[in-house]
Every structure is written in structure tokens, then in C-alpha cells.
């Protein structure tokens, strides 16, 4: 299955929008909203977010191969700006996203499920788990299938990814 940059960017935008709505309404996610949040994959492989995308004239500086991502990138920045309390918070969100472009690659659920199954088959059922780079929590979810009462501590340094994790 090929990595569809445009679809991944769309999925991320919808997940961010959903997280901001949940924050604003101070409530837990519905089943449908959880599904949207779980499609969030971070911005690894989406270097387009490093390009300027404030106004239409910025598009002339984009590579031709990335132009189809210009409008969604503008939408992403607008969404973050509209949901930031001030320019400082907006800049922190964007800086966090940009810092993750080279590092935010998420492990597919099929792999985390297999790892959890192998550990369980070997009678490894942790009472405590530390997830230092949690993303949207796929390792935690997989491990909790076999150790539902485990005490979990999950961290995520990317600010927007951390919001996804908090709502999952």
C-alpha cells in the first residue's frame, strides 16, 4: 500500500480539527471521533508543511510535485491559527509539527498487535508500561489487550499529537 500524502494530510487535518473541537467542548470523543483521531499519522513524510503557506503567492515557491498539497497546507495553518489562543501558541504548534517531519513515522497497528501477541504468548504481561514516544497510542492499545489492568504512562513530545493521544 503506497503512502498517499494528500490523504494523510487530509486525515491529519480532520483529526486536528476534531481534537480542537473536543478541547473546546471539554468532552470525550464519540466512537466516530475516535476513528478520526486514530487516522492521525503525524507529519513524517509530509515535508510540504515546511514550505511557506500563508498566502496564494507562496505557491510559486513550492515544488511542482507538492502543489497539490498547497491548499490543504494552507487549511492546516488556518485551522491551527484559528484554534490557538495567541500567536505564541500558534508558533509553538507549528514549530512542533515542523520538528516532527523527520521523526514522526507511526508503527502500523498490525505490527504492534503482533508484538503484543508474541509477548503474551511468551507469558509476558506487564503490570506497568512506559511509552516514551506514544504517538496516538497504538503500542499501548495493543499491549492493553493482553494486560488490561496495566498501569500506563505515555508521553508524546509533539504538541498536536499529544492532543490526539489525550482524546484517545
Segments from the language model and where they lie:
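Class I S-adenosyl-L-methionine-dependent methyltransferase catalytic core
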Residues: 1-168
Amino acid at each position: 500500500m503506497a503512502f498517499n500524502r494528500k490523504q494523510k494530510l487530509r486525515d491529519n487535518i480532520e483529526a486536528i480539527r476534531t481534537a480542537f473541537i473536543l478541547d473546546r467542548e471539554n468532552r470525550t470523543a464519540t466512537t466516530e471521533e475516535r476513528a478520526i483521531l486514530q487516522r492521525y499519522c503525524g507529519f513524517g513524510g509530509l515535508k510540504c508543511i515546511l514550505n511557506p503557506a500563508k498566502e496564494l503567492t507562496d505557491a510559486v515557491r513550492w515544488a511542482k510535485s507538492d502543489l497539490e498539497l498547497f491548499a490543504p497546507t494552507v487549511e492546516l495553518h488556518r485551522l491551527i491559527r484559528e484554534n490557538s489562543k495567541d500567536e505564541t501558541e500558534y508558533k509553538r504548534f507549528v514549530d512542533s509539527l515542523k520538528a516532527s517531519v523527520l521523526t514522526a513515522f507511526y508503527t502500523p497497528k498490525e505490527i504492534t498487535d503482533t508484538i503484543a501477541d508474541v509477548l503474551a504468548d511468551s507469558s509476558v504481561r506487564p503490570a506497568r508500561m512506559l511509552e516514551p514516544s506514544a504517538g496516538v497510542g497504538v503500542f499501548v492499545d495493543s499491549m492493553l489487550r493482553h494486560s488490561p489492568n496495566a498501569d500506563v504512562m505515555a508521553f508524546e513530545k509533539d504538541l498536536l499529537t499529544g492532543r490526539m493521544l489525550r482524546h484517545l
